[in-house]
Amino acid sequence: MPAPFKVAAVEFNPELFEFERNIERACALTEEAAASGARLIVLPEAALSGYIYRDRAQFLPYMDTVPGKGTEAIAEICARHNCYVAIGIAEIDPATDLTYNTGALVGPVGYIGKYRKNGLNSSDIMWFTPGNTGYPVFDTELGKICMIICYDDTYWEPARLPAIKGADLIAYICSSDRVLTQLGAEAKGNHSTIAAVQQLCAWNGLAMVAADRNNVETNPTTGLSVIYGGSASIWQADGRRTGHLPATDQNLTLNNPGAVLYGEIDPALYVNDQKATLQRRRPELYGELAFYRAPTDTKASAQSHAITVTAVQYAVVAGDTDGNIGRANEQVLTLQDRAGADGIVVFPAFTLTGAPADPDEAAAIAESGLGRTVQVLSDFAVRLHRFVVGSHVERDNGALFHTAVLVAPDGTVTGSYRQTHLDPAYSWASAGDDLPVFDTSIGRVGLLLCEDVRFPEASGVLAVRRADVIAIPTRWDGRYGGALQESKGLFAHGFAPNTMCLWYAVAKTSQAYTVVANAVGDGCQGSSGVFTMNPVDAEAPVVAGIDDAGTVSLDITTRGQPDWWMDQRRLIAGRRTDLAVPVTLGTDSAAFLRWRDTPGYDMSGWTAYSQ
């Protein structure tokens, strides 16, 4: 394992219409970082050209081949200082005349390889072709490096697939504009992707060096100006952010000199608990992730619903069923006192019994599918006139399951879900074999439980199955995930310091309102909340405290608003299902092994065909 090494995230600001000058300036900053001892240096997206051109024709003279003039100049620095550089380049392919938004990796012996951006935003599609490199991983002395570019982070796959392929470290290449809340409705077209890139590390156990621009770019031929967000950051593979630059001040000018963030990456952390969860994936459940369900999906909700969503938290004490019922009922009474509205109320995991400590205790508290827990939840649903979700230990044909139940306002059971990605402590439980989504009068509802949230494939399937709302009873004690480390100043609404990063990520990458209910006491860290589809500039999430019983509610309209930068329909349309196939393959299959073990991104295992 290599020793900790110095890294640099460079907030470099290229100039429009100045390709040669941009190479000189980018090389000067790269030389400075390399001379300071940085072994990995990351520069922003389109770093040699600038970005907001009028059209492809105006952009073309400032594009470069990869490898090309830019990588050749950087290679001299890498050779001189024994370092690696990841840089964003607007690429022209001379063989085809196709143009790509590309990340290039250069090392001590020269050009190593490229990644062509897959997650194209509404500007990218004006002049770039979707990437055709997959998500390659490059083996270096610093670890296995992958590149992710800006809007890619709208999706969970761009980090997950490299992680499954063995990546250790992300070079995140970005030109992310910041939210201008004073613009009102116009701000809703703004995505500010660098604002919350934590999911890329937190879900996959990868280190990351993330670079953005931090200035204003103005195109005098269009009058368009964009303020880039700054907020370069450095992340360890165990999920900690160990370096961070501030968000840009919106009054900065074109002449802002940029900045360099230095820090260290510790390769000893490449082996970590979250990366170990890759061995617990359930590819046999993920088949629909390879389905492209756009532009039309007849399973998707045809209309939106104005509803109230609520998360309930209270002390759930093992062995105190009557007390748990009483504490849950106290919260139900507070909700009954409020004006009635359609909606859904989510209770913590093991709603009435508490979590069993061992198999004997699990067997003792197990119930039938319509046992006491479901009966009490049915009573709550009728009294609240809302859908209700809770969970219990279910006994069925001699097996035990951790089961979530969705109960309708009339008290009938709409559906149930057996936890598919079991917490390691649940040795008594059998795993479920489906990730269902249920049609209801308030839209389509998906269910997850506890450590399911550590697996983006699980919420990914619910998104592909077009869940409008995801309800998650949990018993979270802080052993995984952790607090969301946002970039202050890039959100229209701030986040509570105890916002759980994975719950936020589920909502963001599934584009489904996500309602999580956790217990308090006995090590549980509360923080129940409603996590919104568009937290950057439209809706603030609501999060409960760590210790206190209570409820948190939010009035929402399912499916979001048509003028938002993203919704589930757009998310599904933007997915690269052709590249996502490996998440669905059995890990002992020939196609998976060929993809995992072959350099680059070998898709021949599922694309090769001869008549």
For the regions a language model picked out, list residue spans one by one:
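Short beta-strand scaffold segments in enzyme catalytic cores
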Residues: 87-89, 101-105, 136, 232-234, ...
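Ligand-binding pocket scaffold of soluble enzyme catalytic domains
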Residues: 8, 112, 138-141, 162, ...
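Cys-nucleophile CN-hydrolase/nitrilase-fold catalytic domain and related Cys-dependent amidase chemistry
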Residues: 19, 24-108, 112, 176-206, ...
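C-terminal beta-strand edge segments of enzyme domains
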Residues: 203, 207, 212-306, 437, ...
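CN hydrolase (nitrilase-like) catalytic-core segments centered on the catalytic cysteine
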Residues: 66-86, 153-261, 367-389, 454-551
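Active-site-proximal beta-strand/loop segments in catalytic clefts of secreted hydrolases
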Residues: 12, 45, 88-90, 149-150, ...
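N-terminal glycine-/serine-/threonine-rich phosphate-binding loop
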Residues: 1-40, 301-339
